């Protein structure tokens, strides 16, 4: 209903239904989408955002909660993942993600990737606060897939050591993830040994690793990702969880 009302208002005001994404020329002469750019001369994007907020505000937490609620017939996922989102708003983990995400520390997340845009066509036009919501959704399925939102075993033995916490980071080896390079990050940003033990530090480290993945691979869904829900070749095909939750976000349409 909210989307219908937004479309109706846009039509009445004579605004374009879809904002034109600015095109850029690469050095090889090909044309592409500037994922992190906005055309400041085109006010229609800001007008559409304002209309969306006026109609109903940010209801994205409801989209994430709906995904969790419908994940299993017994509705247990919505209950165990309440630290991320509830039917009334963001839980402490969701709020933590919204609070720590910023364009300086995680520039590649805010720029996005082509496969993220394919799942969320509106991503290039979203404002910073809306982009943060997309990563609450992504982190939601990541902690669901790795630890059932903390309800599963705290540790697990693996070939590379003991995985620990809600994102199953390698205990005592979290800082070694830096070996792939900081990609311009400052010295205070990244993962530290022990981050996997607590949810808040796990989430920050996880976002940092995802930012590094975006920079190195240019993909949300990557065969070399640390997490199964982001690996398209995974035996259980959990990457489909990520595709589903992102594509069903109202702000992405």
Predicted segments with their positions:
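Catalytic glycan-binding domains that act on GlcNAc-containing polysaccharides
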Residues: 42, 49-253
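Disulfide-bonded cysteine-rich modules in secreted/extracellular proteins
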Residues: 29-30, 36-40
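Sec/Tat signal peptide C-region and signal peptidase I cleavage site
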Residues: 15-19
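Cleaved targeting-peptide boundary
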Residues: 20-26
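N-terminal regions of proteins, emphasizing targeting and processing segments when present
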Residues: 13-14, 49
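Short, hydrophobic/glycine-enriched beta-strand segments
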Residues: 5, 35-36
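Sec-dependent N-terminal signal peptides
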Residues: 4-13
